[in-house]
Regions:
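Structural signature of hydrophobic alpha-helical transmembrane segments
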Residues: 1-11, 77-86, 134-147, 205-220
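Transmembrane helix-loop-helix hairpins at membrane boundaries of multipass inner-membrane proteins
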Residues: 1-4, 15-116, 192-200
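Short hydrophobic "helix-edge" motifs at membrane interfaces and signal-peptide entry regions
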Residues: 2, 14, 63-66, 122-124, ...
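Small-residue packing motifs within transmembrane alpha-helices
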Residues: 7-13, 29-38, 81-84, 115-123, ...
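Cytoplasmic juxtamembrane interface segments
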Residues: 7-25, 149-159
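Juxtamembrane/interfacial segments at transmembrane-helix boundaries in multi-pass membrane proteins
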Residues: 49-68, 103-106, 136, 143, ...
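Alpha-helical multi-pass transmembrane bundles of energy-transducing inner-membrane proteins
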Residues: 113-120, 124-206, 220
Length: 233
């Protein structure tokens, strides 16, 4: 079985090829098609989950990049999937206006990269809210970080933009390292890094160290005080 994570990377390559191949003024519509397809699927699944109050298994594998893992949608993740889907479609539609005056100033490659990052951001966010295990979560978390970095770097000619992007990517990877430490610890104690095992860990192990590691890791992404140094940039 191919490691889960490889199909996502292949899909990302296909999406990138579609957006790059589209004519300059059609890139927004190519991106909208890519995002809307995923948004419709995610929204339909989410509505079914919310209406039925049940959990739907989306994927499962015994061979993830770091071990077995799975993804599912329960009522809470369904709510977030709906929010992400609506927001992503709205963002692509809005981009048609705010990128219009860049079409003659930026190269087609630059515009393509921006739209690829936008589509990648959407699918990575869906992966984040539906991952059952820590390692698949981190895979999508990192994909989301890289996509965000590229979006921030769109106006890279400006020094303040480069500085903001650098501050962001450094803080995000410090946070990623902390989360990785936390999930490795969970996996070493409980035999898996599934979120469902956090309760067992906190019942049987000293809770404060792991809590602090996760708080700092997630806090950096959220821009929580005092880990918000990248946010004003």
């Amino acid at each position: 079985t191919a490691p889960h994570g490889l199909p996502e990377l292949i899909a990302l390559a296909v999406v990138t090829a579609l957006i790059f191949a589209a004519p300059l003024k059609a890139k927004v519509w190519a991106t909208l098609a890519v995002v809307a397809a995923g948004a419709l699927w995610a929204s339909a699944t989410a509505v079914g989950v919310l209406a039925g109050g049940h959990t739907v298994r989306l994927w499962a594998t015994d061979v993830f990049l770091f071990g077995s893992d799975a993804g599912s949608m329960d009522p809470l993740s369904a709510l977030f999937a709906l929010i992400v889907s609506v927001g992503a479609v709205a963002a692509v539609l809005y981009s048609r206006g705010y990128l219009a005056h860049y079409l003659g100033r930026k190269s087609p490659t630059h515009i393509s990269l921006h739209y690829t990052a936008l589509a990648t951001m959407f699918y990575a966010m869906l992966g984040v809210v539906t991952s059952e295990g820590g390692f698949s979560f981190l895979f999508f978390w990192e994909l989301m970080t890289v996509a965000s970095f590229l979006l921030i770097l769109f106006d890279a000619e400006r020094r303040e933009v480069r500085r903001a992007a650098l501050a962001y990517v450094i803080m995000m990877h410090v946070g990623f390292a902390l989360l990785l430490i936390g999930f490795v610890r969970l996996d070493s104690v409980c035999g898996s890094a599934d979120f469902a095992l956090l309760g067992e860990y906190f019942r049987t192990q000293p809770a404060l160290p792991l809590f602090v590691v996760f708080l700092a890791g997630f806090g950096m992404k959220a821009g929580m005080f005092p880990m918000h140094v990248w946010l004003p940039e």
